């Protein structure tokens, strides 16, 4: 009987872990983010802003796992954001809620190198915990840039946004 109880206890723990894992969003990798960003740049170079409709398709190739494409002009105006369309048209260059001026840093990178990684903190999906995230951005032939962000694997949680001074 004691052995049966132990086996049932282990099975219950394993089941619980699987249930919690099933609730967690599937996360994209940095390599997947870079590949998606490169594909987005190619599409924008071919179609211009008409590519935004393709980026908005939740069942398409530009929204996989937690990855999606966003686009911004060189002044900081959000041009396309499939997950938060209310941001489109807003100038976010001075956004600094988490202390890292991520959009200003993206613009500076697009102006100087044309492409690369920008690191920042962002709330992890379903929580208020800040985690390390990186976006791979590429300035396209049309004069703006697009990017795709991925959470850094195994990065520790930082403080909650309310804790930031």
Model-identified regions with their sequence ranges:
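N-terminal membrane-sensor/transducer module of prokaryotic signaling receptors
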Residues: 2-165
